[in-house]
Design a protein with these regions (language model features):
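A structural signal for multi-pass alpha-helical bundles of membrane permease subunits
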Residues: 4-294
Length: 294
């Protein structure tokens, strides 16, 4: 009997064992390796020479490039997440209403998110090209401009376009996360509010927002992780150039590892990014959960 009880108690863990093994191999072990590499002296060939403590972190933090890259990463993440959340929420409210061709509009909205980021970035890079771009060609044909306009005269302008592309491909994700929350709201809440004389804005802030808060929390946390670690858009459009002026942590550590052969420093940057990401996501989750409890 005791053996049967023991087996019954172990059964759930046996079912979970394959998942635990996969997580260990593909998630936990790589994280351990990155932490180990960040504290090791690594040759350009990728061979670990020995333990070096926090030397790699010191080299990274002392460099002026890292400060610029960190600032770019924070601007990139905050701008894309905040703006895409606002526009995604508004778009979800629109798509939640019944109107003609709603299904077709929803299919069009999801398209930027469903398409490869490399393709999206490549298309936008072509659109804003000064000499052959579709934007200049269109504006010249309709007579709004007489000669091609340089849409990216500075690194800051390039970075602004990258943020725009990031928002463009992220809005659909937020839209459908919020839309799923909106569709789960019982219409009786709105009917009762209408009877009580509530206007649209009162319904929005007293009923809609509180009831979709969980959907917004999930989409925001996933967006922070997704945008913070985004590589294809910036790499396809500028590769972080000129002089790392448009680099984020992900593209910067890629250059350190594969262009300069500094795997130890690249791992240190990766660890710093990982810790920042964990901190930001944890703070947001704690604040959101406390508000829900209140």
């Amino acid at each position: 009997m005791k053996k049967k009880k023991t087996l019954a108690a172990l059964e759930p863990y046996l079912w979970l064992l394959p998942s635990i093994l996969l997580m260990t191999i593909f998630i936990l072990f790589p994280i351990f390796e990155v932490f180990r590499t960040s504290m090791s002296e690594v040759s350009k060939a990728g061979l670990v020479k020995g333990f070096c403590g926090f030397d790699n972190f010191a080299k990274v933090l002392r460099g002026s490039t890292f400060k610029l890259v960190l600032k770019n990463t924070l601007v990139w993440t905050i701008a894309v997440v905040v703006i895409s959340t606002v526009f995604g929420f508004i778009l979800a409210l629109v798509l939640n209403n019944k109107f003609r061709f709603r299904k077709a509009v929803r299919a069009i909205v999801v398209f930027p998110w469903a398409t490869s980021l490399i393709i999206q970035a490549g298309v936008w890079k072509f659109i804003i090209d000064k000499d052959y771009g579709a934007l200049n060609t269109l504006l010249m044909k309709i007579g709004l401009i007489s000669s091609p306009v340089n849409w990216t005269p500075t690194p800051q302008a390039y970075f602004a376009w990258e943020i725009f592309v990031g928002i463009f491909v992220t809005v659909p994700f937020v839209t459908f996360c919020v839309l799923s929350g909106l569709q789960s709201i019982d219409n009786s809440y709105y009917e009762a509010a209408t009877v009580d004389g509530a206007n649209y804005w009162q319904k929005l802030f007293k009923i809609t927002l509180p009831l979709v808060k969980s959907s917004l929390t999930v989409s925001t946390v996933l967006n922070i992780i997704y945008v913070f670690n985004s590589f294809p858009i910036i790499w396809t459009i500028t590769k972080g150039d000129p002089a790392s002026r448009t680099d984020t942590l992900v593209t910067y550590l890629y250059k350190l590892a594969f262009y300069k052969g500094k795997s130890g420093e690249a791992a240190a940057v990766s660890v710093i990014g990982f810790l920042i990401l964990c901190l930001c996501a944890s703070i947001y989750m704690v604040v959101s959960l406390r508000k829900e409890e209140e």
